[in-house]
Curated annotation (Swiss-Prot):
InterPro entries listed in its UniProt record: 2-oxoacid/accept_OxRdtase_asu (IPR022367), 2-oxoacid_Fdx_oxidoreductase (IPR053400), PFOR_II (IPR033412), Pyruvate:ferred/Flavod_OxRd (IPR050722), Pyrv/ketoisovalerate_OxRed_cat (IPR019752), Pyrv_Fd/Flavodoxin_OxRdtase_N (IPR002880), Pyrv_flavodox_OxRed_cen (IPR002869), THDP-binding (IPR029061)
Transmembrane segment boundaries: none
Protein name (record): 2-oxoacid:ferredoxin oxidoreductase 2, subunit alpha
Keywords assigned: Oxidoreductase, Pyruvate
Annotated Pfam families: PFOR_II, POR, POR_N
Binding site for substrate: T257, R344
Gene it is expressed from: ST2435
Disulfide cross-links: none
Length: 628
């Protein structure tokens, strides 16, 4: 199976993302599957960012620790990624004499790592020395004088060089595409569909062609016919699509990385054709509100839910912290609201543009007091879509806050897959116990056998909501007997959910072996790809991915894990929080750990290396460091 890893890097604000999307689009048009990931600093312009794209004729689920083709147009990209580069480097010859110390945007720690790698080879600290380092390892270097080529393009179209400056990206993209050996027409089409200005299309196409014609066809990739409609989508977008398919009618948010793009997409696509009762088709839409802060965002979402619309908000760590009191209020008042929690590097501001899984226990215990919080976590883009619908259904059925965890890795990564994976079954909407009032007064918190009360909406009858303890009507009371009754009623809903939601729906099990890879969230893809490689070496493994953490599938987990010789927790945090929850709920402990908390994704190769260290050296805890 083909697996080619391509990377492009450069200063933020200079078109790295656009270049990567054009390249990926062109490769996908030739019938290939992709998995791409964007890494960037918490800086608007100037700092180093890069985009990695993995290419294969079969579906791809993970990133790699190496790069086959590194496309660069600045010095920092070469310095940051030369040790990962295995086959080809495309670089700017004008920077050959640039030293590490002259790259002022590079962090001192990274500069020291570069010097250490070059010093081991008794080399200096210039780009020219990096080229020698790569040549010693069989990497071929392809240099371009970008200024000369940009001048040629500017002269051709009789425009100033400043107008076509960013077209140098397309020179690197064109050269990369040429190495693959795919038809230039696909790249030309991708450029045309990206830019609207005719002049921009022309000079970017010329730049790409200059690069394309300057390199040999090395990989000789063949074109594949696309049999079924495919979709190329990132995590923010697929979550928004799932919410729209699930009947979302109100979304509030305050801008925060990496959550904001979801709300922006919903707002851009808020006018919808809706099928309502009786199969009647009518125009409708979603109200999207950018609030003044996260406190307002959660309170707006709660208020909208009380009026009877499907309501959600989206945020990340610091914003989720601010929402804590509002979530507790929603728990007390049994409000069906969804909080999409985009997890990033923490604590505090932490790593605002990097990933992490350190907030699982926070999500499980957010808000003061004991009340039901349903918590689910998605492992890939298809799961995100269906889980977004599921979250809305769970919130209304059990009348409680639902927290849907998506990590930054999945939010900013994109994948290519068959569209039928998100259209192959009906979008079922379950609204729970909604009734029409029969009088002016309604006991909103009526005690029932399953803990779930009939629900009407604001304006349909006299209903009372308060943050204080209350009786069935909603009136404030501190009576001890009532307190016991209402407290049990609220918490009984989680017991009901535990009985009604099949445990098989809460856990994803792949394979059957004595070695278990226990995980949740984004490591899923790296694990599945690693399992395929490990099986070639005769190492049989199985994956157990927890999708719902509350209510926890304790009975099924006990059944699956009982008697296994190795339970290896693979997570993006320090404490293996998913494994800690397993121990808390079942008394079963992980035997080994593969952990990473650098803010970068776990790769396929890191999982393979970690498992081999555990099996061959009996290492208890393998810590991963990869990623620039």
């Amino acid at each position: 199976m083909t697996r080619i890893v391509w990377m492009i890097g450069g200063a933020q604000g200079l078109g790295v993302d656009t270049s990567a999307n054009i390249f990926g689009n062109a490769v996908a048009k030739a019938g290939y599957y992709l998995f791409g990931n964007r890494e960037y600093y918490s800086n608007i312009k100037g700092r180093h960012s890069y985009f990695e794209v993995v290419i294969s004729e079969k579906p791809i689920r993970s990133l790699s620790s190496y790069v086959n083709i590194l496309a660069s147009f600045d010095a920092e990209t070469v310095f940051q990624h030369f040790t990962e580069t295995k086959e080809y480097l495309i670089y700017n010859v004008e920077y050959e004499n640039t030293t590490v110390d002259l790259v002022k945007s590079m962090e001192p720690e990274m500069a020291e790592q570069v010097k250490e790698a070059l010093s081991k080879e008794r080399l200096g600290f210039t780009i020219k020395d990096v080229l020698e380092y790569l040549k010693r390892r069989g990497v071929k270097v392809i240099g371009f004088n970008y200024t000369e080529l940009i001048k040629k393009i500017a002269d051709t179209f009789k425009v100033p060089m400043s107008v076509v400056e960013r077209a140098k990206n397309m020179i690197a993209v064109g050269a990369s595409y040429g190495l693959l050996g795919l038809k230039f027409d696909y790249l030309k089409d991708a450029i045309s569909s990206t830019f609207k200005n005719e002049l921009f299309i022309k000079f970017n196409t010329m730049a790409a062609e200059l690069g394309y014609n300057s390199v040999p066809n090395v990989y000789k990739l063949q074109e594949y016919k696309i049999e079924k409609q495919r979709i190329q989508v990132d995590g923010n977008t697929i979550s928004a699509m799932g919410k729209l398919a699930g009947g979302l009618r109100f979304q509030s948010y305050y801008p925060i990385t990496p959550a904001s793009d979801e709300s922006v997409y919903i707002e851009a696509n808020q006018n919808l054709d809706m099928i309502v009762e009786g199969n009647e088709l009518r125009k409708g839409g979603v109200v999207v509100v950018q609030a003044e802060d996260e406190l307002a965002a959660i309170n707006m979402a709660v208020g909208a839910a009380l009026t009877g619309v499907r309501s959600a908000t989206a945020t990340s760590g610091p914003g989720f912290s601010l929402m804590s009191e509002g979530i507790s209020w929603a728990g007390m008042n049994e409000v069906p609201v969804v909080i999409t929690y985009y997890m990033r590097g923490a604590p505090a501001t932490g790593l605002p543009t990097r990933s992490g899984q350190a907030d699982l226990k926070f999500a499980l215990n957010v808000g003061h007091g004991e009340f039901p919080r349903i918590v689910i976590a998605s492992g890939d883009h298809v799961e995100i879509f269906w889980d977004a619908i599921w979250a809305l259904n769970l919130a209304e059925k059990y009348q409680t806050p639902v927290i849907h965890i998506i990590e930054k890795t999945l939010a900013n990564a994109y994948s290519v897959f068959e569209e039928e994976l998100i259209t192959n079954r009906p979008y079922v909407i379950e609204r729970g116990k909604i009734v029409k009032p029969t009088s002016d007064y309604f006991n909103r918190f009526e005690v029932t056998e399953d803990g779930i009360s009939p629900r009407v909406f604001l304006g349909q009858a006299s209903i009372f909501y308060t943050g204080d303890e209350h009786n069935e009507e909603g009136h404030i009371t501190e009576n001890s007997i009532n307190r016991m009754k209402m407290y049990e009623k609220r918490n009984k809903k989680l017991e009901t959910a535990d009985k009604e939601i099949p445990e098989e729906q809460r856990v994803n099990i792949v394979g059957d072996a004595d070695i278990v890879l226990l995980t949740w969230g984004s490591p899923k893809g790296a694990i599945l790809d690693a399992m395929e490689e490990l099986s070639k070496d005769g190492i049989k493994t199985m994956m157990v991915q927890v999708k719902m953490f509350n209510p926890y599938p304790k009975n099924l987990m006990k059944k699956i894990l009982s008697g296994k010789s190795k339970i290896i927790a693979v997570e993006n945090n320090y404490n293996a929080q998913g494994a800690e929850v397993l121990a808390e709920k079942t008394g079963i402990f992980a035997t080994n750990y593969i952990l990473k908390w650098t803010g970068r994704p776990i790769t396929r190769e890191e999982v393979i290396e970690g498992i081999k260290k555990i099996l061959e050296r009996d290492e208890k805890r393998v810590v991963l460091y990869g990623g620039a």
